[in-house]
């Protein structure tokens, strides 16, 4: 019981630290995204039947697009993405992030983290949790493709985003088989090789 309590306490502290970090991301180094992109976000939100207002912010603090919040969601877009990606790719990325909001993934992820915290000792929980995270991204990729109409645009958007994020580590991603490469292969219908 003491070991379980210690594990829960450590993971709860980790969860709280993560929450504080996310709140800091929302508040610091952000500015409203250009009006044209806010209008595109509003149009995509309407197509996804999202009734809540969504704030679209440009952030110098994030390297990848991020959704924060459930009741008052905020999409943080990296400044490099807004200035360095083509409009079709950027729209595909934005559609993916809005799909997370449509699916209430922020809340689902919090509940998932709670289960991980309480059942941290069980390997099946961590395996299943990893699978859920992969499938959550796949579902959002599929929704983005259904909105934007072209899996190749979404795949190129992911590749462009990774290039902007980590130009010097591009080969590392390909060599390690990171989840991004699996998502790109899945979108364009190229089978992934296991092992």
Describe each region flagged by the PLM.
Residues 1-195:
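Membrane-embedded and juxtamembrane structural elements of multi-pass membrane proteins
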């Amino acid at each position: 019981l003491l070991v379980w309590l210690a594990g829960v306490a450590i993971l709860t502290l980790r969860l709280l630290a993560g929450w504080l970090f996310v709140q800091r991301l929302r508040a610091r180094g952000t500015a409203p995204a250009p009006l044209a992109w806010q209008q595109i976000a509003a149009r995509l939100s309407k197509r996804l039947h999202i009734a809540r207002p969504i704030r679209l912010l440009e952030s110098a603090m994030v390297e990848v697009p991020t959704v924060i919040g459930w009741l008052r969601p905020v999409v943080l877009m990296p400044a490099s993405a807004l200035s360095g990606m083509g409009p079709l790719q950027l729209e595909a990325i934005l559609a993916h992030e809005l799909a997370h909001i449509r699916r209430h993934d922020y809340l689902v992820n919090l509940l998932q983290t709670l289960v991980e915290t309480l059942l941290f000792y069980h390997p099946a929980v961590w395996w299943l949790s990893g699978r859920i995270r992969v499938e959550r991204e796949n579902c959002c990729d599929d929704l983005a493709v259904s909105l934007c109409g072209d899996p190749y645009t979404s795949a190129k958007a992911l590749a462009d985003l990774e290039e902007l994020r980590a130009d010097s580590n591009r080969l590392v991603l390909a060599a390690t088989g990171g989840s991004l490469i699996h998502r790109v292969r899945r979108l364009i219908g190229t089978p992934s090789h296991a092992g």
